[in-house]
Design a protein with these regions (language model features):
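Short substrate-entry loop that stabilizes the transition state in hydrolases
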Residues: 40-47
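Conserved alpha/beta-hydrolase
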Residues: 47, 53-75
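Hydrophobic beta-strand anchors of alpha/beta hydrolase catalytic cores
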Residues: 34-36, 63
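Catalytic nucleophile-loop/oxyanion-hole region of alpha/beta-hydrolase
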Residues: 44, 71-102
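The alpha/beta-hydrolase serine catalytic core
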Residues: 8, 18, 115, 121-158
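N-terminal cap/lid segment of alpha/beta-hydrolase-fold proteins
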Residues: 1-32
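Alpha/beta-hydrolase fold nucleophile elbow
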Residues: 99-111
């Protein structure tokens, strides 16, 4: 017996429509609402995103997992987003949930998604809990992962 339900959840992000899935607990009220940010180039269907979201839903939490711009079924160009663009999309996800009456107080980020969640949390005062799973914590590691050049980032601001 499944004690959760799964629904498609689309919303507007920094580069167009973003495709998501929301895992909802079968019972009301929810114990909390979370947004899950996936790892670099992984997507909402990754094993980590799927398992964490479903497990939390079965424990009473509503969890939105979505594809960043340019990945999966989401619009946009993946190579044009950057860390701050992904953070913008997390903020958009939280705002879209609020429009549905779901107040997000938890951000969860896996790997690169953890870095994006940290960046987004600074703009979301309603977020009370920030969870990272294997998130990079050194700037050089993040830059190596995304193949970025410090001078280019400083000049472009992204």
């Amino acid at each position: 017996m499944t004690v959760r339900k799964t629904e498609r959840f689309a919303f507007t992000g920094s580069q167009g429509d973003l495709a998501g899935i929301i895992e909802l607990p079968a019972t009301q009220p929810h114990r909390g609402v979370a947004v899950f940010a996936h790892c670099f180039a992984c997507g909402r269907q990754s094993i980590a995103a799927t398992r964490v979201a479903r497990d939390l839903a079965e424990r009473g939490f509503a969890v939105l997992r979505f594809d960043f711009a340019g990945l999966g079924e989401s619009e946009g160009e993946f190579g044009q987003t950057g860390l701050l663009g992904n953070a913008d999309d997390i903020v958009s996800a939280v705002e879209a949930l609020a429009q549905r009456g779901l107040q997000c107080s938890i951000l969860i980020g896996h790997s690169y998604g953890g870095a994006a969640a940290i960046a987004a949390a600074t703009r979301l005062p309603q977020v009370e809990h920030l969870v990272t799973i294997g998130a990079p914590f050194e700037v050089d590691h993040v830059l190596d992962t995304i193949g970025a050049d410090r001078a280019e980032l400083a000049g472009a601001g992204r």
